[in-house]
């Protein structure tokens, strides 16, 4: 009986210590989720090297999600999908990128029918490009453009596929 009491007291003591102990720390995640890649003039950038966020600015439910799925089918890496702020007004499609004339922005813009507006800005999260779908969205081209040549030498942050998107 003494042995059982000792096991019970010891187990209770260990259990209470574990219950109130500091949890183990999570492993550190690298701050960079992409690596720089320099493309020389004429070198190709493919869709699987571009992460795209898609935001709905048109009000039709599900447009951003459907467009994101279609872009993934074309080979683009998925980014954030959601709604644009209420004050944003878009006709067909707006492509937002750090450099709107750069090959990654042009490759994304080449997927859409109709007039595509290019705007300089910083896409959210770790995306290279952000697409805003407007009220007059006419859709995506039936045959996707899967690669595009760089018009000039450019350094692009290519998503690191070893890190999961959150």
What feature does the model see in each segment?
Residues 10-17, 39-42, 52-57, 89-96:
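A broad, low-specificity signal for short, low-complexity segments enriched in glycine/proline
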Residues 1-28:
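N-terminal membrane-targeting segments
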Residues 135-166:
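Extracellularly exposed regions in secreted/surface proteins, prominently low-complexity, repeat-rich
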Residues 25-85:
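Extracytoplasmic low-complexity, Pro/Thr/Ser/Ala/Gly-rich segments
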Residues 66-68, 74-138:
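BRCT (BRCA1 C-terminal) domain core and associated BRCT-interaction motifs
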Residues 7-10, 43, 54, 86, ...:
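Residue-level signal for the start and early helices of compact helical domains
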Residues 10, 62-63, 103:
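Residues that form or flank phosphate/diphosphate-binding pockets in enzymes
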